[in-house]
Each structure stands twice: as structure tokens, then as C-alpha cells.
């Protein structure tokens, strides 16, 4: 008896085929290699006007033109492209925030006005975002980590400016403030911006490393491309015998079970290849 209401037993033929273990937005999935014709880097493809959000486009395969499906969209996840766009917009906004911050620090120092923006690196928009941001993209996290110290020093510049106001000699005070502003403008801010841009480059690289799994139906006549984030391993999938409460996942017609494998740690959700393929092959034709 299956432990999961949605779990379907593997066929005898599937048992003798390893599974493709892949990643999709920080979660692990598998699909039996019996249903996989080929594994490709994302090829050049044509977008389809007014296509559903789960159809990325079509590309030439040896059997003709086949559709590329966005498995993220099919499972109710944010698409890779949307995730990249959001990240690009966030980086651009936080970059401009800190350019504006330095501009305002220079202006208020020169005018003698009170600086009203935050001196706390954890309370600016970038700091608030970074403190709660997590990613399994090591490149992104590496460059964001490198941003911490120059970001701290940048915000500490306002405290240094305030202390410099205690210098009695006007010329000495002006020299000190010019030095502080120069460090903020030419050292700390560029390092923050460079780290953000390199984090974005790493994110872009990971998107470019997406993989297409070319699936085939039982007859071998119909094919579709399934876009996934990254292929991790090809090995045996071991269906779980322990009850798990994945209520939202149970509602997906594209998930057939849950299990593990030896080389990749963590729970792995098994994709029902037949359901994915039939969603395209047997999809109702749109009315004119």
C-alpha cells in the first residue's frame, strides 16, 4: 500500500531505469530516464505569440519542431526569467539607492544640513533585503558576502562626518571631511556596486545553465522539451515509505510521489512524465 494518496508505483520497466535528478527553484525532483530521449543545453528557440505561461517556445529537434514547457510554471513556481528580472530590478534599485545615499551625504556635509538617511547598514533597503535573502547559488552568496564590509564602512561614513564636526580648525575639519567623502565615493560605494553586479552576473550564469529534458511518449512519436534549472545526477530513485504532509504538492497532477537517492541529499519529488506529456499532446485545441 502506498504511503501517499498521490503516489503511483513505478512500472517494472521504470524500476530498471535510473532517474534524472534535477533542481527546480531550490527543490529536488526526479523523472525516470525511460521517458527521456535527450538532455540538452537550452537551444535557440522561437517564442509563440499569446502562448500560455507554461510554454516557453518551440525549437527544432530531429522529429521536427517541439514545444519547450516551463516546469516551474506547471508547478506554480516563479519562472526562471521572472526570477532573473526581479533580481535585476532589485540590484538596479539598490545600486541607485547607494549612489543617492553618497550624493546626499556629500550635499548635506557641504551645506551643513542634517543627514536624514540611515547610518545603519541593516536598515537601508539593501540591508533589509540581504539579511533575509538566501540562495543555494554559491556564486551569488559569495559576492553578496564580499559586499558586507564595504557596505558597513559606507554607512559608517555618516558617523565619521559627525565626529569630524568636533574638529576646531576649519581647514583640518574640511580636509577630514573631504577624505571621508572621497573614501565613500571612490572606495566603499564602488565595492558595494561591484559586488552587487558580480552577484547578478552569477545569477545570470545560473539561468543560462538551464537544461532541457526532451521527453518522449510511450509510442516514441511525440516529444516535448522540459526546462529545468540544473541536472544533478543520474541514479536510482528510491520511493519513500514514510508519510509526509505535502498537502499543496498532492494537488499537482504532475507529481507522482516522493523519495530519495544515494548521491543527492534531501527529499525528491518524482515527476509523472506521462501526465506532463499528455498535458501537451492531449491539450484541447484553442478556438479561433
Where would I find each of the regions flagged by the language model?
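DNA polymerase processivity clamps
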Residues: 55, 71-86, 201-220
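N-terminal membrane-sensor/transducer module of prokaryotic signaling receptors
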Residues: 78-207, 285
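Short flexible coil/turn linkers enriched for glycine and charged/polar residues
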Residues: 14, 25, 52, 206-207, ...
Amino acid at each position: 500500500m502506498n504511503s501517499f494518496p498521490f503516489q503511483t508505483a513505478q512500472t517494472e520497466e521504470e524500476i530498471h531505469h535510473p532517474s534524472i535528478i534535477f533542481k527546480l527553484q531550490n527543490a529536488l525532483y526526479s523523472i525516470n530516464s525511460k521517458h527521456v530521449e535527450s538532455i540538452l543545453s537550452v537551444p535557440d528557440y522561437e517564442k509563440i505569440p499569446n502562448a500560455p505561461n507554461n510554454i516557453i517556445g518551440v525549437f527544432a529537434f530531429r522529429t521536427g519542431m517541439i514545444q519547450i514547457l516551463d516546469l516551474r510554471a506547471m508547478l506554480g513556481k516563479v519562472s526562471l526569467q521572472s526570477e532573473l528580472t526581479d533580481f535585476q530590478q532589485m540590484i538596479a534599485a539598490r545600486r541607485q539607492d547607494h549612489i543617492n545615499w553618497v550624493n546626499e551625504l556629500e550635499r548635506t556635509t557641504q551645506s551643513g544640513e542634517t543627514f536624514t538617511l540611515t547610518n545603519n547598514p541593516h536598515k537601508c533597503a539593501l540591508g533589509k533585503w540581504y539579511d533575509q535573502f538566501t540562495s543555494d547559488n554559491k556564486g551569488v552568496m559569495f559576492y553578496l558576502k564580499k559586499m558586507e564590509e564595504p557596505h558597513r564602512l559606507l554607512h559608517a561614513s555618516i558617523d565619521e562626518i559627525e565626529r569630524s564636526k568636533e574638529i576646531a580648525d576649519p581647514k583640518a575639519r574640511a580636509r577630514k571631511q573631504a577624505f571621508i567623502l572621497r573614501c565613500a565615493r571612490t572606495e566603499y560605494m564602488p565595492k558595494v556596486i561591484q559586488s552587487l553586479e558580480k552577484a547578478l552576473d552569477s545569477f545570470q550564469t545560473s539561468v543560462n545553465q538551464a537544461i532541457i529534458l526532451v521527453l518522449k511518449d510511450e509510442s516514441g512519436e511525440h516529444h516535448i522539451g522540459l526546462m529545468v534549472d540544473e541536472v544533478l545526477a543520474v541514479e536510482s530513485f528510491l520511493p519513500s515509505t514514510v508519510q509526509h504532509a505535502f498537502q499543496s504538492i498532492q494537488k499537482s497532477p504532475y507529481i507522482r510521489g516522493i523519495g530519495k537517492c544515494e548521491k543527492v541529499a534531501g527529499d525528491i519529488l518524482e515527476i509523472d512524465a506521462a501526465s506532463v506529456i499528455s498535458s501537451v499532446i492531449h491539450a484541447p485545441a484553442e478556438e479561433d
